[in-house]
């Protein structure tokens, strides 16, 4: 899944700091070259100790091999329950702000935009799979290059050394919140769901049938 994203938010408790289960996914994110935005949540909890939490987070990043740039992470303080966030750990000031806009502003400011090419030959890598009794196997992935349409003929490849195999897309869907909606086109940069191809695996590349090219297969831990 991390191969589909351009940035990550690391949510840490203002009292407890990074939890043991945080370590695995953080290591993966850092290895992907992603620069986390750290969100110190529950800043209004009694006993909140944001300075200690940030030191613990810095130490965790350092132990996981973070680069100097990744260690220089932006920080947002928030209370998700009460709906406010900002760049200060002063709770009274955060209450005056009264909204979560600071998180969205941080995403816009710090998450880089990929140079995806919507006009090149199609390249879409499947990163996860779902299943429906109605449409069968569903592939989820990001369009790395080009455009894709419903009912279009494509090629699928399992890695650069794989043999291109002809296939046909049925539906294309996009996420809209927790829902899925059918669309008539998707292009480079979009995260989509495709139906109609039963031979999909994690890491399969859906590519242009006339110019087949595959990304390296993904490793799954």
Label each PLM-derived region with a short phrase:
Residues 1-221:
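Structural and coupling elements of P-loop NTPases
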């Amino acid at each position: 899944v991390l191969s589909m994203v351009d940035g990550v938010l690391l949510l840490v408790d203002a009292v407890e700091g990074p939890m043991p289960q945080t370590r695995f996914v953080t290591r993966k994110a850092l290895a992907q070259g992603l620069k986390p935005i750290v969100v110190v949540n529950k800043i209004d909890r009694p006993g909140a100790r944001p300075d200690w939490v940030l030191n613990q987070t810095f130490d965790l990043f350092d132990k996981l091999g973070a680069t100097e740039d990744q260690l220089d992470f932006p920080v947002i303080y928030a209370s998700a329950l009460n709906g406010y966030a900002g760049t200060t750990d002063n709770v009274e000031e955060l209450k005056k702000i009264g909204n979560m806009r600071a998180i969205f502003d941080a995403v816009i400011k710090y998450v880089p935009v990929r140079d995806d090419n919507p006009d090149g030959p199609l390249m879409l890598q499947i990163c996860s799979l779902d299943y429906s009794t109605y449409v069968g196997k569903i592939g989820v992935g990001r369009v790395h290059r080009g455009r894709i349409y419903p009912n279009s003929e494509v090629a699928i490849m399992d890695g650069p050394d794989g043999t291109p195999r002809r296939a046909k897309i049925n539906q294309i869907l996009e996420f809209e919140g927790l829902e899925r909606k059918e669309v008539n086109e998707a292009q480079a940069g979009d995260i989509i769901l495709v139906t109609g191809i039963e031979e999909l695996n994690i890491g399969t590349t859906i590519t242009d049938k006339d110019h087949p090219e595959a990304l390296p297969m993904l490793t799954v831990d």
